[in-house]
């Protein structure tokens, strides 16, 4: 069924020529139907179908099939039975009253029940199926013959009183029109039935029941049994019967409308009386239980009440309240949904070292870069050590030359021996220079070895770390530092014999000479040996200390960061606490305002009540 109403229902069974129905509404609310096409045989069979007479024969194509017999119309008694049944099950079958949770199965069950009740009723002359009854329901609601309800009912009942305004004379005129039209259309073996009470509601305020979609009323046409006969005489007889039934039905409807108007007026009077009695009872109750507004206060409420107190306008009120700390503040205090996290507060146990390293050096270093840095640092440490050694050796040579010159001045007599001493000293100097060159060569070789070792270590560590992240972690530290610090101590065994050799030579060679130079030389050489030993010890200590220092530095950093983390956690908790306290203040304020508002409402109502009492007493 389409939402256009019942008008096209008859044409649905396959007739090819569609009838155009023009409805003209006269002043008195009557309807005259003119056919748009003169040869609309069989189309309009169901068009005017007023009281929903359930003609399930449908219209067939004109010459191919004979006409099916019309089922007899509903009598007035049957209509009353159906109206009462509809009224009983109205909440389910009526679209206006149907709730969303009602599914179509419950609707279908109620329709089945209506059909059963109707067919089992004693006043029913012929059995009807669900399709016919549903069609009657639709048509009767379209023509506003149902629902006959008093003013109490909701929905489309507002315009029902107007139905009775159609006068009996208008009905008689319409019946005459019907008879004429039916006599004309008997030539086409068809009948157009026009209803007296079909009235389009002129008010836009009441929404037309005609405009309701019929899809919501589930129709199942499975059990419509079509009988094939073509007795034309039987059809003409049925049409005459229908005319008589129509006249009887129109009279019955007019009577029913008058009765119903009287009933609705009586019911409205009764309702007014009841509502007045209820109002009086309420007023007396209020007088006995007088509310003392001043005794109400927001302070008496407990914390739980406040927490459970969440009115609908909670947020709007909060926006109007100023922040408690700022007397002049106008900004709105928003509470972020997620607590803001500090960057260091995200450290977990697993990624802790990583986070510390990136905190100390914000740029992340790959392993190769780190090893290159370490290598440069080691070379930088070696260079000043070499420079010191060279400077000390030069100083020693100058001191020896000075001492030799002094000895030569004292021992001019022993010129030959002095010359021999000078020659020996030159030889010693040459030997020392050779030794120095050898030392430098050895140091260069050591540096090359160090570089090779460091490269090998780097390759090994890279092989280990290829599976992991390229960023630097603590696990690489001890291996790299060991690789750099171990070779630093290598010059120790080499330098000891080198420095000891000239001392032995000088002791041997100068022993025959004067006592003064030999003592001075021995002291100088002892000082040199002590200085070199101190340097070596310092280098060893530096190598060991640098590793320990680094570890200690990282430990200190870690402790500092842990401390920072705890401080941040406590700060976050403090912030949360402050927020919660602020929220509580807001809740209290909101609640106080709400209570004040309710007090005002109660006062207003009390004043209105007093005025009403005065009015009623006067």
From Swiss-Prot:
DNA-binding annotation, residue ranges on this chain: 66-146
Domain of life: Eukaryota
Bias (Acidic residues): 213-232
Location of this chain's protein in the cell: Nucleus
Pfam family, one: Myb_DNA-bind_5
GO MF annotation: an example: DNA binding
Bias (Low complexity) ranges: 39-64, 171-186, 233-246
Signal peptide: none
Annotated segments matching region Disordered: 31-70, 148-246
CC annotations in GO: nucleus
Job description of the protein: Involved in transvection phenomena (= synapsis-dependent gene expression), where the synaptic pairing of chromosomes carrying genes with which zeste interacts influences the expression of these genes. Zeste binds to DNA and stimulates transcription from a nearby promoter.
Entries under PANTHER family matching the protein: CYSTEINE AND GLYCINE-RICH PROTEIN 2 BINDING PROTEIN, IPT_TIG DOMAIN-CONTAINING PROTEIN
Designated name of the protein: Regulatory protein zeste
């Amino acid at each position: 069924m389409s939402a256009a109403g019942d008008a096209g229902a008859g044409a649905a069974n396959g007739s090819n020529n569609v009838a155009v129905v023009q409805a003209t509404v006269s002043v008195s609310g009557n309807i005259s139907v003119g056919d748009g096409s003169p040869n609309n045989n069989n189309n309009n069979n169901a068009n005017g179908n007023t009281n929903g007479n359930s003609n399930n024969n449908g219209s067939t194509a004109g010459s191919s099939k004979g006409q099916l017999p019309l089922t007899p119309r509903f009598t007035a008694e049957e209509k009353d039975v159906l109206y009462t049944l509809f009224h009983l099950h109205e909440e389910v079958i009526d679209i206006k009253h149907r709730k969303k949770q009602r599914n179509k199965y419950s609707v279908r069950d109620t329709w089945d029940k209506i059909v059963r009740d109707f067919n089992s009723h004693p006043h029913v002359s012929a059995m009807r199926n669900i399709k016919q009854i549903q069609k009657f329901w639709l048509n009767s609601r379209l023509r506003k013959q149902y629902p006959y309800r008093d003013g109490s009912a909701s929905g489309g009942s507002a315009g029902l009183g107007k139905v009775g305004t159609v006068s009996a004379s208008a009905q008689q005129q319409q019946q005459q029109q019907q008879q004429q039209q039916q006599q004309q259309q008997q030539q086409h073996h068809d009948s157009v039935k026009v209803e007296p009470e079909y009235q389009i509601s002129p008010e836009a305020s009441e929404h037309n029941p005609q405009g309701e979609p019929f899809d919501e009323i589930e129709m199942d046409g499975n059990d419509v049994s079509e009988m094939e006969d073509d007795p034309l005489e039987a059809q003409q007889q049925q049409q005459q019967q229908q005319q008589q039934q129509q006249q009887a039905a129109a009279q019955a409807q007019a009577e029913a409308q008058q009765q119903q108007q009287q009933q609705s007026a009586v019911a409205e009077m009764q309702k007014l009386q009841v509502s007045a009695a209820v109002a009086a009872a309420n007023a007396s109750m209020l007088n006995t239980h007088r509310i003392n507004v001043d005794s109400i206060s927001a302070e008496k409420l407990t914390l739980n009440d406040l927490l459970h107190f969440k009115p609908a306008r909670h947020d709007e009120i909060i926006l109007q309240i100023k922040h408690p700390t700022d007397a002049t503040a106008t900004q709105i205090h928003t509470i972020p949904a997620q607590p803001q996290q500090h960057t260091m507060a995200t450290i977990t146990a697993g990624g802790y070292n990583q986070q510390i390293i990136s905190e100390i050096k914000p740029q992340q270093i790959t392993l190769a870069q780190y090893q290159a840095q370490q290598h440069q640092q080691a070379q930088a440490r070696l260079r000043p050590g070499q420079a010191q050694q060279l400077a000390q050796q030069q100083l020693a040579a100058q001191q020896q030359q000075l001492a030799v010159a002094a000895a030569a001045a004292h021992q001019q007599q022993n010129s030959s021996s002095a010359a021999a001493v000078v020659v020996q000293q030159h030889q010693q100097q040459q030997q020392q220079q050779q030794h120095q060159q050898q030392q430098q060569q050895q140091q260069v070789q050591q540096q090359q070895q160090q570089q090779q070792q460091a490269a090998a270590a780097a390759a090994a560590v890279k092989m280990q770390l290829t599976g992991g992240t390229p960023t630097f972690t603590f696990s690489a530290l001890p291996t790299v530092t060991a690789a750099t610090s171990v070779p630093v101590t290598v010059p120790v065994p080499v330098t000891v014999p080198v420095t000891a050799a000239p001392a032995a030579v000088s002791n041997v060679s100068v022993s025959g000479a004067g006592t003064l130079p030999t003592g001075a030389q021995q002291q100088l050489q002892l000082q040199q040996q002590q200085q070199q030993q101190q340097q070596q010890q310092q280098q060893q200590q530096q190598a060991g200390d640098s590793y320990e220092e680094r570890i200690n530095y990282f430990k200190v950093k870690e402790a500092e960061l842990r401390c920072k983390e705890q401080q941040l956690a406590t700060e976050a908790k403090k912030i949360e606490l402050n927020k919660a306290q602020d929220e509580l203040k807001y809740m209290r304020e909101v609640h106080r305002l709400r209570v004040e508002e309710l007090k005002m409402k109660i006062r207003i109502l009390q004043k209105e009540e007093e005025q009403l009492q005065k009015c009623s007493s006067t």
